[in-house]
Swiss-Prot record:
Protein location: Secreted
Tissue: Plasma.
Protein family per UniProt: Belongs to the ALB/AFP/VDB family.
This protein's record includes keyword NAD: no
Entry GO terms, CC: extracellular space
Protein name: Albumin
Residues given in the record as Cu cation binding sites: H4
Functional summary from the UniProt entry: Binds water, Ca(2+), Na(+), K(+), fatty acids, hormones, bilirubin and drugs. Its main function is the regulation of the colloidal osmotic pressure of blood.
Originating species: Neoceratodus forsteri
Entry keyword Protein transport: no
Coiled coil region boundaries: none
Start and end residues of each Albumin domain: 1-80, 81-101
């Protein structure tokens, strides 16, 4: 029975990997779902979606740490935005207007 279970697990592991490759990595047209865009496009997307992105961060931080005062959550959000964006997207430095970053 242990060998049978092992074979079943291996089968599902292979089938699962194939489904992942077919569903996530490749769409029907043969291209992946994630498109590489230019630095200007990335900057534009970030600038257009900055408020919802940071709103989601503030909401999540406040929900996970209900004991923190609102001012601390906002301070962490500001530090996260200025630190995480510049570290995660160093190519945005210099392409975005100064009021965005």
């Amino acid at each position: 029975d242990a060998e049978h279970k092992s074979n079943i697990c291996k089968h599902f592991q292979v089938v699962g990997e194939e489904k992942f490759k077919n569903i996530i990595l490749v769409t029907q047209d043969g291209h992946g779902p994630f498109i590489q865009v230019s630095k200007e496009e990335q900057c534009k997307h970030y600038a257009e979606n900055r408020v919802p992105y940071m709103g989601n961060f503030i909401y999540t931080a406040a929900k996970r740490h209900p004991d923190l005062p609102a001012t601390e959550v906002l301070i962490y959000a500001f530090x996260y935005e200025s630190g995480a964006v510049l570290v995660s997207y160093p190519e945005m430095v210099g392409c975005c207007p100064p009021d965005v970053l």
